[in-house]
Amino acid sequence: MTGWTINAAELRIPRRSRIAAHRMIVIADPSGRAVRQLNGLASWFDNELHAWRHKPIGYLPTDRLRGYDTKTHPRTFMPINGAVLPDWNIAPAIATGAARVLTDDLTRDEVDLRLAPALDALRRINALARGPDGGAGLPYPFMGFGRNSNSFFATMLHAMGFDHPTFANAAWLVPGARGLLLPASEIR
């Protein structure tokens, strides 16, 4: 592979297991280093810090599902199954099928063009309920069973026109994997 890539990847729960997965969009630079992610995360607004915070899974009635771009919210960068530390190189994950290339050989500007419809969908998801920093998104389903972060991933795929990838040694539980958070006719 040459150039920038847009990829599908997972955070395994527990790490390196096949029990469950949180799926995400990962952008890698030409060296294969993951430099950006789009994630849907269980969130709550911290009134003391005046900022949204996130946690591994939602379980409180006040938890919200919001979308994040690590370009503007770097603390939402999640561990990537199969990637190599210290720089989150995803080439080994791609080689084993733990991550999938959605499109490759892109310039940085082409990445921005491909991400534009997904970022628009992210903003629209967050704006579904009033709240600070673009909105409060959607109620997070108890323990993630329902439309959740994997539904956010499915919505991002749909917005960019990508098919759902198949991961090697797929996780057994991926709730919300094919659900969309916005009507299909309104995405793109």
Q: For the regions a protein language model found, what residue spans apply to each?
A:
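Active-site or metal-binding loop neighborhoods of secreted/extracellular toxin and effector enzymes
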Residues: R147-R188
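Non-catalytic ligand/cofactor/substrate-binding and regulatory segments of enzyme domains
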Residues: M1-G144, A159, L181-R188
